[in-house]
A protein has these predicted regions:
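Pre-recognition alpha-helix immediately N-terminal to the DNA-recognition helix
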Residues: 86, 97-99
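A short acidic, leucine-rich amphipathic alpha-helix
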Residues: 99, 112-116
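Short capping segments at the starts of secondary-structure elements
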Residues: 105-109
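Conserved segment of winged-helix/HTH DNA-binding domains
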Residues: 147-174
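DNA-contacting interfaces and partner/effector-binding or oligomerization modules
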Residues: 1-61
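Residues within helix-turn-helix
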Residues: 110-111, 122, 129
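Short amphipathic alpha-helical boundary/capping segments
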Residues: 83-91
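Beta-hairpin "wing" of winged helix-turn-helix
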Residues: 134-142
Length: 174
């Protein structure tokens, strides 16, 4: 497992040289965006296999630590079939579909989502973590709250991604 974690650190270090810090954080965490009002001067990104699909976030004065999930099999991580399976698992639940509908209408914070669904905030966190891992939602901090937003670019790509995985010859043919 250590080689997997080292490889992820090397990959993120290389990305850090080519992309803005906010984009790197969002990519590593699967959709967490730091708000502009965060008083953070340093960010630490640390990969973990054990917290999947959750991110563990700890804050110290001026420093925020993101422990983010990585896949065990790096050869499959990011593969189209694996990502599509994660996406369909995420939308294969009526509660998560309702969440997508709600945040598609407007961004919402956690307790607001839980209240509208009639579930505990812990249950809402579970559903939102799966949706975030599938890149269907992102969370943005603002005013001390995390707001959840639909990622319309992922929704728009579902059909195309399924066709890619199935292969052009399989789609529409018998």
């Amino acid at each position: 497992m250590l080689p997997l974690l080292r490889a992820d650190v090397e990959a993120k270090t290389a990305l850090a040289r080519t992309m803005p810090a906010d984009d790197l954080i969002e990519r590593a965490t699967g959709g967490i965006a730091m708000g502009t009002d965060a008083e953070i001067s340093q960010v630490v990104l640390a990969p973990s296999y054990f917290c999947r699909p959750y991110n563990l976030i700890t804050e110290y004065p001026g420093v925020r630590l993101f422990v983010y999930p990585v896949d065990l099999a790096p050869s499959e991580a990011g593969s189209p079939a694996r990502e599509l399976a994660r996406l369909f698992k995420a939308i294969g639940d009526d509660t998560r579909l309702r969440i997508l509908q709600m945040v598609g209408e407007r961004e919402m914070y956690l307790q607001e989502i839980a209240n509208r669904l009639g579930v505990t905030h812990v249950t809402a966190i579970h559903h939102l973590a799966l949706l975030r891992a599938a890149h269907l939602v992102r969370s943005v901090e603002r005013g001390g709250l995390k707001y959840y937003q639909l990622r319309p670019e992922t929704v728009a790509q579902v059909g195309e991604r399924l066709r890619d995985v199935m292969g052009a010859a399989q789609v529409g043919g018998r």
